């Protein structure tokens, strides 16, 4: 499915966190586009920083950091010929399972099965009337 990501994002007041994966027309190269945006001051206080083997989020101004729990994480980690991209600290869990070959053929699923999840929040859901 082809989408013009520029038009989509330009028309969206709050795109939140996003991950786009794609490949070159010849299928030989892959790309990842990742963006972050926040509603709260704490969530907006982060930027990407390159690290060995990936990209992580860090506080733009450490003095303004309130709660790092949901905003500071490895966003991208590369393991041999595999790249793990997520929008939270589950990147580390998946990378650990895949790197250790803990469940051959099922590492991704097995890693996520170890996680707990927040309850669904409908505070931003607008239902039709």
Give the label of every model feature segment.
Residues 1-64:
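Extreme N-terminus nucleophile/cap motif
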Residues 9, 58-65, 76-96, 111, ...:
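Alpha/propeptide regions of enzymes that mature by internal proteolysis
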Residues 103-122:
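Glycine- and acidic-residue-rich phosphate-binding/metal-coordinating active-site segment common to enzymes
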Residues 92-106:
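Active-site-proximal, acidic helix/loop segment immediately C-terminal to a metal-coordinating Asp/Glu
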Residues 72:
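Beta-rich catalytic cores
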Residues 13-16, 27, 77-80, 121-122:
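Short, well-ordered loop/turn elements at secondary-structure boundaries
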Residues 68:
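Cysteine protease catalytic core and zymogen-processing segment of caspase-like enzymes
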Residues 123-129:
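Conserved small/polar residues in nucleotide/adenosyl-binding loops
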